[in-house]
């Protein structure tokens, strides 16, 4: 499984981002433009929403939950990249 700093995401053309935080966290802070919301605990039931044949970037508050989800998806054969630092470290614009 790969990791990059969350602020590198803005340099990537058309990234597929999954935000694994809870709904209340998204309402409080917003998320990166275009991110798909799939809460961490629901990921196993939503695998059909996650593309298998392209890079998928996983986002959370600080990078810990996203690391766990990325490791899980990596074991299932997904091409995943953890966004280190999460929303707390992200310096770009957030969308609600």
Where do the model's predicted regions map?
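Short, surface-exposed ligand- or partner-binding patches at beta-edge/loop junctions that are enriched
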Residues: 59
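Rhodanese-like catalytic fold shared by cysteine-dependent sulfurtransferases
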Residues: 1-16, 23-55, 64-96
């Amino acid at each position: 499984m790969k990791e990059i700093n969350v602020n590198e995401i803005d340099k990537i053309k058309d990234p597929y981002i999954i935000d694994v935080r809870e709904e209340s966290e998204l309402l409080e802070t917003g998320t990166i433009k275009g991110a798909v919301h799939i809460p961490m605990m629901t990921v196993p039931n939503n695998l059909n929403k996650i593309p298998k044949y392209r890079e998928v970037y996983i986002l959370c508050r600080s990078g810990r939950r996203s690391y766990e989800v990325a490791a899980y998806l990596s074991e299932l054969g997904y091409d995943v990249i953890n966004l280190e630092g999460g929303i707390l470290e992200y310096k770009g614009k957030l969308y609600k």
